[in-house]
Design a protein with these regions (language model features):
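N-terminal nucleotide-binding beta1-loop-alpha1 segment
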Residues: 3-6
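A short, flexible beta-alpha/helix-coil linker loop
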Residues: 8-11, 61-63, 130-133
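Short, surface-exposed acidic-centric catalytic microdomains
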Residues: 12-72
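C-terminal capping/extension of enzyme domains
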Residues: 21-22, 29, 65-81, 107-163
Length: 163
């Protein structure tokens, strides 16, 4: 499973740790949904590999807010992400933020959940953005959606997923 954020925030850029801003709910939601046996801190991101999980971004440029990115940056990021997925061949790509998914892959009507698109043999799922700015989703409702992904991924053969 490769999780893909939108782009590094300023705190992530400063620390080198994904989803590092204290208000970001990625790490709590990852645990609440059963992907990790305990809540990891951003500085523990390397432990994801031991659970069969990886993490990357659509766009490498750090910004204070994702809306500072251009449409071209998203499109270029989508192409680079596709190449990365083709090289690494995870079973699943989980794009954390449906708006980023829509922009990166040119699918303006995409919704949260499994996507028809596949990248090689990799299945794709768009997840809600765990940023504290996303008030439409609570940690609990996000954990439900992340849990749906986990259940679908476990149905493949469960390799690398805890539980």
């Amino acid at each position: 499973m490769l999780f893909c954020g939108i782009n590094p925030g300023l705190m992530t850029a400063a620390t080198g740790h994904h989803f590092a801003r204290p208000g970001n709910r990625f790490w709590p939601v990852l645990h609440l949904s059963g992907f990790t046996p305990r809540q990891l801190a951003p500085a523990e991101q390397e432990e994801l590999l031991s659970y069969g999980l990886g993490i990357t971004n659509v766009v490498a440029r750090a910004t204070a807010r994702a809306d500072e990115l251009s449409a071209q940056e998203y499109r270029d990021g989508g192409r680079l992400l596709t190449a990365k997925v083709e090289r690494l061949r995870p079973r699943w790509l989980a794009v954390v933020g449906v708006t980023a998914y829509r922009s990166a892959f040119g699918e303006p009507k995409a919704r949260i959940g499994p996507q028809e698109r596949m990248i090689g043999g990799t299945r794709v799922w768009a997840l809600p953005n765990p940023s504290g700015l996303n008030a439409h989703w609570t940690a609990a409702t996000m954990a439900e959606e992340y849990g749906r992904l986990r259940a679908a991924a476990s149905g493949d053969d469960g390799a690398g997923l805890p539980g």
